[in-house]
């Protein structure tokens, strides 16, 4: 995790206040929520405690593919996490924190009952259209 802390410090100009490991996902990448105190700037009028996501991968090509695709999708107006910084070796990166609720969790009630609500259906359709 030390390379991730160095990348965060280079990007933000400060050390993180706190880092929490996020539960494992289906990939070999490890995700961390990095908490820090933001400073007020012209493009960021709010300041205070905020967070970003730090990612440490095991495959440089996979990491660079993901960050490249994220930047491309963002340039096309697709709502994806913004990539803030990538390490020189491509093994870790920092991206926007979009919150704690995943699509899997958002449709859990419908998935478990076999009866999706209108809200869950709309969310799934929106996601499929974006793909």
Which role fits each region the language model picked out?
Residues 2-5, 28, 63, 67:
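Short, well-ordered alpha-helical scaffold segments within catalytic/effector domains
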Residues 14-36:
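ATP-binding glycine-rich phosphate-binding loop
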Residues 12, 24, 45-47:
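Generic structural signal for beta-strand residues in well-ordered domains
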Residues 1, 29-30, 79-81:
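Localized chelating/binding microdomains
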Residues 1-20:
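Juxta-kinase regulatory segment immediately upstream of eukaryotic protein kinase catalytic domains
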Residues 3, 23-24, 58, 85:
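Alpha-helical protein-protein interaction elements
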Residues 34-131:
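ATP-binding pocket architecture of kinase catalytic cores
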């Amino acid at each position: 995790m030390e390379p991730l802390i160095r990348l965060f410090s280079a990007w933000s100009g400060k050390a993180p206040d706190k880092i929490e490991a996020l539960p494992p996902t289906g990939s070999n990448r490890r995700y961390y929520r990095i908490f820090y105190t933001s400073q007020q700037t012209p493009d960021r009028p709010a300041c205070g405690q905020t967070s970003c996501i730090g990612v440490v991968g095991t495959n440089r090509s996979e990491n660079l593919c993901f960050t490249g695709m994220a930047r491309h999708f963002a340039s096309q107006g697709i709502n994806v996490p913004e990539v803030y910084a990538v390490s020189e070796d491509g093994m870790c990166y920092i991206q926007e924190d979009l919150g704690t609720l995943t699509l899997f969790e958002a449709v859990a009630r419908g998935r478990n009952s076999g009866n999706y609500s209108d809200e869950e259906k709309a969310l799934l359709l929106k996601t499929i259209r974006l793909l």
